């Protein structure tokens, strides 16, 4: 079975290594691969796995066939609105660093379709399940915003202050999901609380960016910081914000 992976970065190749181990024929497409034509990579694919940076998704979607099942592994998407024209899409997300997946360390993720679980499950890679595609995508984006604030506050893992922060941030994410036609319970899955715990500390790029901001207000990173992109989209009104979210209010006030 051929599976096309769009995005040959660390996470895309980590997922590809699992699929190859399970006997799938993998074909990658990446903007850096000038020799590859997207149409050739997608030809005869039974599934497409989307692993490109979130900012690239709107530019790529018009060229992806709408009738091939699409597995969204990109994080940083605030809603699933851009996928409304696709006949069959599902989401894979959660607290998994690519290096840990490649090393076959124990990793737990969230899937929104049994086919994702069937394709990717290994003894070292396990899943919980929800059919809340929008909620899973939102969790994968919002946790990056809160990780920036954790870095700005200098919170250290496993301290009482860190636990309090993660608990409050997760409650706020649940409220945001409920206010945007998603399931608040999704925040309690691996894609929610699990990924939040992983991201609110080093070596998370979002957390690291927050530590820099604490000393250099307005600092603009050279590399993509998904939490900063998401925060700017939130400030533009791309999702509904209920009242009573002090942590989100604080971090948005600190970001340009």
What do these predicted ranges mean?
Residues 1-47:
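NAD(P)+-binding Rossmann beta1-loop-alpha1 motif at the extreme N-terminus of oxidoreductases
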Residues 4, 26, 137, 178-256:
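NAD(P)-dependent Rossmann-like dehydrogenase/reductase catalytic/cofactor-binding core
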Residues 8, 12, 57, 78-80, ...:
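Generic structural signal for well-ordered, non-membrane alpha-helical segments
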Residues 12-15, 42-106, 116:
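Rossmann-like NAD(P)(H) cofactor-binding subdomain of soluble oxidoreductases
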Residues 22, 63, 88, 106-186:
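Internal alpha-helical scaffold of NAD(P)-dependent oxidoreductase catalytic cores
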Residues 72, 88-93, 127-131, 188, ...:
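General beta-strand structural signal in soluble alpha/beta enzymes
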Residues 75-77, 93-97, 113, 131-135, ...:
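Glycine-rich beta-alpha junction loops
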